[in-house]
Structures are given as C-alpha cells and as structure tokens.
Amino acid sequence: MKMLLLLLCLGLTLVCVHAEEASSTGRNFNVEKINGEWHTIILASDKREKIEDNGNFRLFLEQIHVLENSLVLKFHTVRDEECSELSMVADKTEKAGEYSVTYDGFNTFTIPKTDYDNFLMAHLINEKDGETFQLMGLYGREPDLSSDIKERFAQLCEEHGILRENIIDLSNANRCLQARE
C-alpha cells in the first residue's frame, strides 16, 4: 500500500511539473512571467553563419520588459571583442502568442516552451530579400542550464529541422556579462 501511495505521489508530482511549462501559443501562457533578466545559453539556426562569431543574429539577451502589446528586448553584441548594447521592440501580431520585430529583415517569433523560472525557448523566422531562415534560442534566468534542458532544446531544434551541428552552446563564450548593469 505504501508503495502504491508513493507511486501515486510521484505521478502527481510529474503531472504538476509538466503543467508548469507553457507555450506562448497556448492558453495557459502568462507573458508577464517572462519579464526580467535572461541569459543566452544556446543559439541554433538552419543558417549557422547567422549565429557564428560576428553573425548578425549572435545576440546575447539581457532583459525582457513586458508592455501591454509588446516586448522590449535588450541585447548585447560582440564585435572585435567590444560589447555593444542593442534594444528593440517586438509587437504582438494577430496570431496568438506571436511577436514581430524588424532587425536585419522582418522577424516573427514565438516561445514554444518556458517554465518562467529557469528557461525560455524561442523560435524565430527571419524574412529578408525573399529569403527566410529560422533561429532558435535557449535562454536561462542564470548564466547556464542543466544538460537535460539543453538536450530538450536540441530535440526541439531537430523537430524544426535544425541539425545538431547548427546548435552552438554559448555558455562559455563572451556574452558581455560584464556589460550588464
């Protein structure tokens, strides 16, 4: 009987933990909970050169500020070993949970998975000059995340057609942590 009770408790715990995850396109998504400080952990793209050193999309997220119909995103970039700050405003689109921002083309993005307290996974599609590419980012409240979360992110990338060799772990890269206020 004790073993059955223990298994029931374990099962309920797993259900509760799973229920805490949300997607920006789902009904249970609370955008207010993504407000605050974040760190870029991993970037992935079907055009790897966009996220390699000096790539235009090698951006290091510092903060998300939630407004009524938009998000203010504060990033840092590294060019020639120098950190620069970059802020942009992403506006809600007509699609549930989708935002758009103009940066090196027109971008739309969603947040397919987040638990609000530890990680956020974003999926972006860029359109420029008739060409498109996709980018995915794993962001954490702390400067690094567990290997389990990183593996879940890699699997999500594969589900979107991004190969593992196009996934770059930036947890040991210069992410301009010293430039944070």
Swiss-Prot record:
Localization, UniProt: Secreted
GO CC annotation: cytosol; extracellular space; nucleus
InterPro entries: Calycin (IPR012674), Lipocalin (IPR002345), Lipocalin_CS (IPR022272), Lipocln_cytosolic_FA-bd_dom (IPR000566), Maj_urinary (IPR002971)
Protein's GO biological process: aerobic respiration; cellular response to lipid; cellular response to testosterone stimulus; energy reserve metabolic process; glucose homeostasis; heat generation; locomotor rhythm; mitochondrion organization
Disulfide cysteine pairs (residue numbers): 83-176
A family per Pfam: Lipocalin
Keywords: Behavior, Disulfide bond, Pheromone-binding, Secreted, Signal, Transport
Principal location: secreted
Gene Ontology MF annotations: insulin receptor activity; pheromone binding; small molecule binding
Signal peptide feature range: 1-19
Domain of life: Eukaryota
Function of the molecule: Major urinary proteins (Mups) bind pheromones, and thus stabilize them to allow slow release into the air from urine marks. May protect pheromones from oxidation. May also act as pheromones themselves. In this context, they play a role in the regulation of social behaviors, such as aggression, mating, pup-suckling, territory establishment and dominance. Binds the pheromone analog 2-sec-butyl-4,5-dihydrothiazole (SBT) in vitro.
Family (UniProt): Belongs to the calycin superfamily. Lipocalin family.
Protein name per Swiss-Prot or TrEMBL: Major urinary protein 11
